[in-house]
Amino acid sequence: MQGIESDYSPDLLRGNTDVLLLSLIDELGSTYGYQLIKEIEKRSQGFFRFKEGTIYPALRKLENEGLIRGEWQELPSGQGRRYYWITQEGKETLTKKIAIWQSFTTAVNLIFKPNEV
């Protein structure tokens, strides 16, 4: 499948990385940073290509806010990996942020395509 054209301003995504991460962590259950990077890229058909320098600070922020919890687990190879799970507070925050996002996109669509909404 061919990717979506990704000529967009990062400003459009600013402030919404958290909701993308919360949504995926909620759906996937136990997951880790690199898996989230790949899943976002796959689901967006390559539109969003996050770097580790974006994802890991965002995950730490979510963890510090109590919206997710993280735990180091040792792999059979002996290496460690930090897995993340969403908390109840994270689920509640996700529900609110999705509602806000849906209202926002509806309002934008009223401007872009007033006869189609």
Regions found by a protein language model. Name each.
Residues M1-G15:
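Intrinsically disordered, low-complexity serine/threonine- and proline-rich regulatory segments
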Residues E89-V117:
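Amphipathic alpha-helical dimerization/coiled-coil segments
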Residues E63-G80, W85:
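Beta-hairpin "wing" of winged helix-turn-helix
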Residues I55-L62:
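Basic amphipathic alpha-helical segments that dock to polyanions
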Residues I40, S44, W72-E74, Q88-G90:
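Short, well-ordered turn and helix-capping elements at secondary-structure junctions
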Residues D11-T54:
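N-terminal helix-turn-helix DNA-binding core of bacterial DNA-binding proteins
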